[in-house]
């Protein structure tokens, strides 16, 4: 994940200048936030679609709105297009097709042209910004229903419109927003009038009889997202806790953040059309029209400034353990030498213990590597080694870049000696970490982690990390305590 605040501000100034020169053109002319329920198609619903008539009526109005904007290209973001955890995949090629055969309606077919000029321009913007997006890893596939359902309605009013199809990723919302900014720059580069189709359902957990059951987070997510989007409160998109979004089982938040980023620095006229969750899944339809420059709405810049101030305050209060881990991360990223500071507490130089270094960025895990028992001659050396590894060698993430350093939240856990336990009742998710072992497989989970609320969750995650089925007989368990340094 890369953010270069000074470069970002310079790019933003250039972007604002170009919009000022062509203020009346408004190259991102508008956007629609829409769901993608296959049942909305009469060929799939066979009458059941009438139960979501509010959504159908709103979709027709949204399609008419798109036609009124007279776009040259639709940029459609879909959570169901093949994507990657750390990369925004842009579909390549000149054409694509698909059908609703998966939903027993093979006769409903779609064929579209991809706007190859726009794809190229967007890839160039991403390359120049060092941003993880492009088509080089794309594996051409048929159109997905996250794209086809919106097209079902839009093509009635705007036939033969070329599209750009973009998959969501597992990257933080700040990166989704930044992608939207790059889409706006690509529209300026190509001189094309763009309408963004932010395809995404809301929560899937709103009815006991629904496909995912009921969870309180479901209707709460819908209430919040509809209010924030209808108010144009795009900065609030960064504030939805990841665990909360996962609990709500939403699939559109990334699409909405990309769309919001495309309007960065611009006023937006908004019209909320509908919301319902008849089948237990939230469907929301909102229209957005670009109303011109508004320098008060640079939400990513504001977010970065606030996050840096928060991290600076935390660093000022950090103890020697966390400061040493941060110094090691910085040295690893900058490929600079690091020597043990002269003022370290004596226990860091004389004691030996296992240590875990955890790195978060914008409240998302960015790296975590540790040792169950001591492998170095001192706790200090253990921290240096594991901080370096967490920043560069965690297989789940790309190595941390220099531009990320101001936004990293780094903590250190020093482990006590593990002790065997005979039953899960001897665990406490807040107090004890757990180690599970079966044969040559071993997994560990630290205590007091966000989103881990039960002993069963703790054991299941530790087993999953080790490739162990929690139901397997003969799993050995140990517990340990930690001292956390921040």
Set out the residue ranges of the language-model regions.
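Flexible, D/E/H-enriched segments
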Residues: 19, 26-72, 83-181, 209-320, ...
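Structural motif
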Residues: 73-75, 195
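Active-site beta-strand/loop microenvironment that shapes enzyme catalytic pockets
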Residues: 167-221, 359-379
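Short, basic/aromatic recognition patches
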Residues: 313-353
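A short mixed-secondary-structure module that forms the rim of ligand-binding clefts
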Residues: 372-399
């Amino acid at each position: 994940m890369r953010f270069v605040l000074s470069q970002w501000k310079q790019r933003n100034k250039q972007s604002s200048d170009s919009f000022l020169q062509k203020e009346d053109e408004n190259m991102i002319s508008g956007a629609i936030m829409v769901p993608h329920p296959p049942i909305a198609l009469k060929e799939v619903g066979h009458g059941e679609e009438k139960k979501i008539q509010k959504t159908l009526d709103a979709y027709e109005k949204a399609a008419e709105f798109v036609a009124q904007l007279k776009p040259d290209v639709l940029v459609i973001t879909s959570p169901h297009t093949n994507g990657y955890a750390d990369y925004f995949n842009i579909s390549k090629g000149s054409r694509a097709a698909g059908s609703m055969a998966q939903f027993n309606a093979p006769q409903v077919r779609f064929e579209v042209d991809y706007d190859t000029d726009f794809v190229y321009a967007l890839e160039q913007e991403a390359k120049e910004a060092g941003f993880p997006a492009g088509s080089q890893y794309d594996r051409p596939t048929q159109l997905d229903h996250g794209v086809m359902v919106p097209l079902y309605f839009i093509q009635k009013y705007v036939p033969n419109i070329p599209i750009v199809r973009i998959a969501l990723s597992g990257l933080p919302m700040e990166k989704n927003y930044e992608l939207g900014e790059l889409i706006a720059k690509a529209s300026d580069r190509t001189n094309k009038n763009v309408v963004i189709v932010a395809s995404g359902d809301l929560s899937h957990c709103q009815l006991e009889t629904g496909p995912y059951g009921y969870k309180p987070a479901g209707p709460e997510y819908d209430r919040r997202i509809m209010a924030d989007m209808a108010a144009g409160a795009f900065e609030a998109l960064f504030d939805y806790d990841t665990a909360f979004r996962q609990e709500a089982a939403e699939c559109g938040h990334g699409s909405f953040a990309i769309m919001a980023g495309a309007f960065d620095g611009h006023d937006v006229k908004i019209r909320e059309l509908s919301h319902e969750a008849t089948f237990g899944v939230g469907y929301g339809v909102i229209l957005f029209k670009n109303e011109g420059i508004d320098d008060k709405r640079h939400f990513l810049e504001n977010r970065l400034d606030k996050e840096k101030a928060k991290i600076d305050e935390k660093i000022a209060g950090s103890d020697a353990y966390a400061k040493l881990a941060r110094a090691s991360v910085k040295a690893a990223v900058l490929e600079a030498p690091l020597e043990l500071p002269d003022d370290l507490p004596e226990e860091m130089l004389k004691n030996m213990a296992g240590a875990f270094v955890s790195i978060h960025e914008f409240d998302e895990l960015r790296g975590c590597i540790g040792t169950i028992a001591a492998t170095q001659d001192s706790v200090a050396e253990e921290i240096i080694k594991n901080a370096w590894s967490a920043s560069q060698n965690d297989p789940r993430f790309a190595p941390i870049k220099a531009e990320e350093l101001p936004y990293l939240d780094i903590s250190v856990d020093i482990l006590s000696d593990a002790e065997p336990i005979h039953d899960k009742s001897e665990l406490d998710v807040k107090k004890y970490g757990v180690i599970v072992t079966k044969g040559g497989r071993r997994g560990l989970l630290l205590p007091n982690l966000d989103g881990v609320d039960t002993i069963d969750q703790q054991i299941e995650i530790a087993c999953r990390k080790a490739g162990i089925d929690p139901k397997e007989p003969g799993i050995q368990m140990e517990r340990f305590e930690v001292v956390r340094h921040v």
